[in-house]
A protein has these predicted regions:
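A residue-level marker of the well-folded mature domains of exported/periplasmic proteins
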Residues: 4, 13, 20-266
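Positively charged n-region of N-terminal signal peptides that target proteins for export
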Residues: 1-9
Length: 266
């Protein structure tokens, strides 16, 4: 799969913004976790940009989406003498105290994708609400093409706090205003593919016609659930498609990389 060009370009800009610095200085990249393909791709882009700029970028992300681990990563970056931190915050508040301490220590903060409530040098992200609306429109197109003009839609998201995925969900919901579809209460899988699959399987048992995934783990879980369900006709739409083998390929008609939609055959 092609890398997300816009993401790589943003990383170059982020690194430049984070360093009105001399070559050889250190930048910490702290994302929500270190296993989501989105963040792995982000790190790959950061490493390429760092090589061009002559700075060092260290991927210091937690193993899983955990506020305490992310706070520890921020503290370790400050203790390690890093001049800048590029961070995708799990939520707006949890790591704010740690980031404030980093700023007080002279560390520059740059947000990518998901900001916290601490002033930063810059924030780089896609228009997640607009991208979410596009995802909703893609689902409506796919459902209409399948002759489905009403029914329940499930949502599998990460949590109720992460800025980027909350906005994606809001945009997705807005696409269905004035339609005969019914958006069910959101269920949270913490970005974990296995948990998200269980949620999606429950939605399918309830008879939904479509399921939306707010991030890569959610989308992977939805795809696995749709595959396991057989020929149910459930339509899945999600974000941040993985470079890993895709058991849901051909069953997930629209997967979004940042804000750019991609449609696969049904």
């Amino acid at each position: 799969m092609k890398k997300i060009v816009a993401l790589l370009l943003s990383l170059c800009l982020v690194l430049g913004a984070a360093s009105a610095m001399a070559a050889g200085e250190k930048i910490a990249l702290i994302t929500m976790d270190s296993i989501d393909q989105h963040w792995i791709t982000l790190n790959e882009g950061a490493q390429k940009a760092a090589e061009e700029l002559g700075v060092t970028v260290t991927f210091m992300s937690p193993n899983t989406k955990d506020d305490a681990q992310q706070i520890e990563c921020v503290n370790n970056a400050v203790a390690g003498g890093y001049q800048a931190i590029i961070v995708a915050a799990n939520g707006p508040d949890a790591i704010s105290s740690a980031l404030n301490e980093a700023v007080e220590a002279g560390v520059k903060i740059v947000y990518v994708d998901s900001p916290a409530n601490v002033e930063a040098e810059a924030t780089f992200s896609t228009d997640n609400q607009a991208a979410g609306k596009t995802a909703g429109e893609e689902m409506i197109k796919a459902l209409t093409a399948a002759g489905i003009t009403s029914g329940d839609i499930g949502i599998v998201n990460v949590n109720a706090a992460t800025d980027s995925t909350v906005k994606r969900e809001a945009g997705f919901r807005s696409a269905f205003e004035g339609t005969d579809y019914n958006i069910l209460e959101t269920q949270y899988g913490e970005g974990d593919a296995a948990k998200s699959q269980t949620i999606a399987e429950n939605y399918i048992t309830q008879g939904v016609v479509g399921i939306f995934g707010g991030n890569e783990g959610s989308t992977t879980g939805i795809g696995n659930a749709i595959k396991a369900s057989g020929d149910t006709g459930v339509i899945g739409v999600g974000f941040d498609k993985s470079d890993a083998p895709e058991p849901h390929q051909g069953r997930l008609p629209a997967v979004h990389h940042g804000s750019e939609p991609r449609r696969d055959g049904l």
